[in-house]
Amino acid sequence: MNCCRRVSCWKDNIAEFAALQATREDIIKMRQALQLEERELASSAPGGSESGDMQFHLAIAEATHNSMLVELFRQSWQWRENNPMWLQLHSHLGDTLYRKEWLVDHKQILAALIKKDARAAKLASVAAPGKREAASAGVFQC
């Protein structure tokens, strides 16, 4: 989980920076990603597609208008997809309830970005991984 904490740290900062840079078009992309995430949750079985989740986080990175941060996001997502620990976590968190909670977190992040409230965006982004870590506490025991 240490690696997840490190990734969360820079993702929080990306959300904070995106709040200051996001354009109307960026916000539209984030809304579309959340709509996709909602459709995926409504129509898929546990363990279904998470394309909306990925698109939401990508849209936040793109809203910084910083190509290095976008590339950092893409690389970290790829690492996540290939990480045995993350795959194990997802095999245990097949319940869509967790994904629904994460969607609520995403809506809070988006609300802060719409208001261009960098502090609120960072705080909302910080809260989300804490919930994931709590949910996974029983999965990874040292």
Regions of interest found by a model, annotated:
Residues 91, 95-114, 118-142:
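C-terminal-biased regions
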Residues 3-87, 106-108, 120-132:
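Conserved amphipathic alpha-helical segments that form helical-bundle/coiled-coil interaction surfaces
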